[in-house]
UniProtKB/Swiss-Prot annotation:
This is Large ribosomal subunit protein eL36. Keywords: Acetylation, Cytoplasm, Ribonucleoprotein, Ribosomal protein. The lineage of its organism: Eukaryota, Metazoa, Chordata, Craniata, Vertebrata. It comes from Rattus norvegicus (Rat). Pfam families: Ribosomal_L36e. Gene3D superfamilies: 60S ribosomal protein L36 (1.10.10.1760). It comes from the Eukaryota. PROSITE patterns: RIBOSOMAL_L36E.
Length: 105
């Protein structure tokens, strides 16, 4: 308990101490993307391309039907948060494709 005010009583009483900073537990890194995982996923995406439902969702996103695309993806993947993440991923892919097409011209 660090001394914040020169008082002997109350919530802030006690000696001045430096906080012992502990490094985060190993279990906290669950879900973080590693270089190898990213490489493997990119390789699979390159070989397999997109699933039919992803292609349909991309068509919906092309014509600015974002809400309809979200509802469609949610029906396919199960949860709202996963659907939002998938929609974001697909819209990033479309943006990259547009950027590549503009660069090519």
């Amino acid at each position: 308990m660090a001394l914040r005010y020169p008082m002997a009583v109350g919530l802030n009483k006690g000696h001045k101490v430096t906080k012992n900073v502990s490094k985060p537990r190993h279990s906290r890194r669950r879900g973080r993307l590693t270089k190898h995982t990213k490489f493997v996923r990119d390789m699979i995406r390159e070989v397999c391309a997109f699933a039919p439902y992803e292609r349909r969702a991309m068509e919906l996103l092309k014509v600015s039907k974002d809400k309809r695309a979200l509802k469609f993806i949610k029906k396919r993947v199960g949860t709202h948060i996963r659907a939002k993440r998938k929609r974001e991923e697909l819209s990033n892919v479309l943006a990259a494709m547009r950027k590549a097409a503009a660069k090519k011209d």
